[in-house]
């Protein structure tokens, strides 16, 4: 049953490990197989803000979409964003400048491969600098959360 659930996105198993403080998580899902970061960026109409060629071709194995303001105020364990693997994309919505998510990621020992800002107001230079320092691909998209989920379901 666990393997079947995992093969279909892992929602049931993920919900078994869910915490009361995960109201910030809009969606979390694992992919059946790895997908190159470039494919994901193309599918969500993303614009790369930071990241070099060798990182862009690496695979990711899932994603998490999170409300950045709720995450800052409700998460006790930042690692709850990672699901089965940190080789994933973390989407942050409600981003104004992009500093807070990148500072939180920098402070945590486990890093995602990709950070994607959903409809950010603007991106501060500090956010891109932190992404470069941590070797994280930083992307922005104008897709909303529903559009992102619809597109990413194709990867399963």
What are these regions (language model features)?
Residues 90-91, 114-118, 136-142:
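Short hydrophobic alpha-helical runs that function as membrane-insertion/retention elements
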Residues 2-98, 141, 146-156:
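Non-catalytic interface/targeting segments
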Residues 97, 120-121:
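Short alpha-helix boundary/capping motifs
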Residues 38, 104, 128:
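Short glycine-/small-residue-rich flexible loop motifs, especially phosphate/cofactor-binding loops
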Residues 99-101, 124:
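Amphipathic coiled-coil/heptad-repeat helices and related helical stalk/stem segments
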Residues 104-116:
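Mid-chain, well-packed structural core segment of small domains
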Residues 122-129:
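Short, glycine/polar-rich helix-capping loops at beta-to-alpha or helix-loop-helix junctions
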Residues 8, 110-111, 132-135:
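Short, structured coil segments at secondary-structure junctions
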């Amino acid at each position: 049953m666990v393997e079947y659930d995992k093969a279909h996105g892992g929602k049931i198993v993920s919900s078994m490990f869910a915490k009361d403080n995960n109201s910030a998580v809009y969606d979390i899902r694992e992919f059946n197989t790895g997908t190159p970061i470039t494919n994901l960026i193309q599918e969500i109409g993303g614009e790369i803000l930071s990241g070099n060629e060798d990182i862009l071709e690496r695979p990711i194995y899932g994603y998490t979409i999170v409300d950045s303001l709720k995450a800052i105020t409700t998460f006790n364990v930042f690692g709850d964003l990672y699901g089965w693997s940190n080789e994933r994309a973390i989407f942050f919505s409600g981003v104004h400048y992009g500093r807070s998510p990148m500072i939180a990621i920098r402070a945590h020992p486990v890093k995602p491969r990709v950070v994607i800002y959903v409809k950010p107001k603007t991106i501060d230079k500090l956010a891109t600098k932190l992404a470069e320092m941590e070797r994280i691909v930083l992307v922005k998209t104008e897709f909303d959360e529903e559009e992102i989920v619809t597109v990413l379901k194709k990867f399963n």
